[in-house]
Each structure stands twice: as structure tokens, then as C-alpha cells.
């Protein structure tokens, strides 16, 4: 049994166009804010109530940064899987501050566009940067690249899933 689990799953809307920065060696880092809301009816008044939470998401995964940079805009609905990380920083007056963020890096991160891009089907992200079939895009870093080893979580093999019904054989294999 695992000693601990650090996994965050969010479905929400992007509050502003993502900010893309680059490290000194040119690798992209995407920052975005995701709003999640819950609604309920007040027991006493019957009035509909809503509470919105804002989440800071930081994407270090190079393949997912490309997806964010090209397709994610303000208002986009996203499904995100990542990890919580708290970082310490100092403000202008020298006081220590802490920020808790949802971080997407490595193999355990997912970013899926639920409302599509420009009216097409939803796009999915999972670390790599290749296109799949079936009316959606899937970026799957769990597949081996054509070079044999994975580099930076990128995949060179497109995932041809999504429309598997034409490949389905009706015969039972036993």
C-alpha cells in the first residue's frame, strides 16, 4: 500500500488567457487560473447559492505547455489532473508568503479540453504532443516514442483510439 497520495482533479473554466513564460534554457512554463463552482439551494430561503473557488495551475510538462499555448483561452472548460505543491516566496517588503498551486509535470499530469477548440471535439492532454483520431486530440505520454526511449514525456506515436467500433471484431475469441 502506498504511503501517501497527492492528486488533484479539477473541472473548471479558465479565468484569463494563460501566461506562457520560458526558462533560461527555453523550456515553456504555463500559468493559468481555473474557476470551479458549486451551487446549492439555501434550506431556509430556497434561494440558489453559488460559491466559486479559484485555483492556480502551473504546467511544467513541455507537451502540455504546447497545448495550453496553442488552444487554451479564457473561458475554456478544462479537466485537469495534477499534484498540489506549496512554494515559499518573499513579497516586496521581505515577508515570507506561501502559494499552493496545482502542478502538472511528469507522467501523472493530464489536461483535457472539454469544450473543444473552435467547435471541434474536446482535446486531451497527457504529456506528449501528437494528434489522435476520433474527433479529438489525445496527447499520450505513456506510449513509447519511435526512438525507443521517452524524452521529456513526449510521444511520437499518435494514438489512433477514439473510434474503435470499426476495428471491433464481433467474433468471440474463445
From Swiss-Prot:
GO terms for biological process: DNA recombination; DNA repair; DNA replication. The keyword DNA damage applies. The keyword Nucleotidyltransferase does not apply. Residues 114-174 are annotated as: Disordered. Residues 119-136 have a biased composition (Gly residues). GO terms for cellular component: nucleoid. Residues 5-111 form the SSB domain. A motif (Important for interaction with partner proteins) lies at residues 169-174. Keywords: DNA damage, DNA recombination, DNA repair, DNA replication, DNA-binding. InterPro entries: NA-bd_OB-fold, Primosome_PriB/ssb, ssDNA-bd. Plays an important role in DNA replication, recombination and repair. Binds to ssDNA and to an array of partner proteins to recruit them to their sites of action during DNA metabolism. Homotetramer. This is Single-stranded DNA-binding protein. The gene is ssb.
Amino acid at each position: 500500500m502506498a504511503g501517501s497520495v497527492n492528486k488533484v482533479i479539477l473541472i473548471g473554466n479558465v479565468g484569463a488567457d494563460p501566461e506562457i513564460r520560458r526558462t533560461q534554457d527555453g523550456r515553456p512554463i504555463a500559468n493559468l487560473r481555473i474557476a470551479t463552482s458549486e451551487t446549492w439551494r439555501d434550506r431556509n430561503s430556497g434561494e440558489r447559492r453559488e460559491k466559486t473557488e479559484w485555483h492556480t495551475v502551473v504546467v511544467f510538462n513541455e507537451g502540455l505547455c504546447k497545448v495550453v499555448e496553442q488552444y487554451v483561452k479564457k473561458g475554456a472548460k478544462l479537466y485537469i489532473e495534477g499534484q498540489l505543491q506549496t512554494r515559499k516566496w518573499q513579497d516586496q517588503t521581505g515577508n515570507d508568503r506561501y502559494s499552493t498551486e496545482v502542478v502538472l509535470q511528469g507522467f501523472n499530469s493530464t489536461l483535457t479540453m472539454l469544450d473543444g477548440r473552435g467547435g471541434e471535439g474536446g482535446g486531451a492532454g497527457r504529456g506528449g504532443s501528437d494528434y489522435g483520431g476520433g474527433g479529438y486530440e489525445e496527447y499520450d505520454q505513456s506510449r513509447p516514442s519511435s526512438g525507443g526511449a521517452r524524452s521529456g514525456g513526449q510521444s511520437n506515436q499518435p494514438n489512433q483510439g477514439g473510434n474503435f467500433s470499426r476495428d471491433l471484431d464481433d467474433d468471440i475469441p474463445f
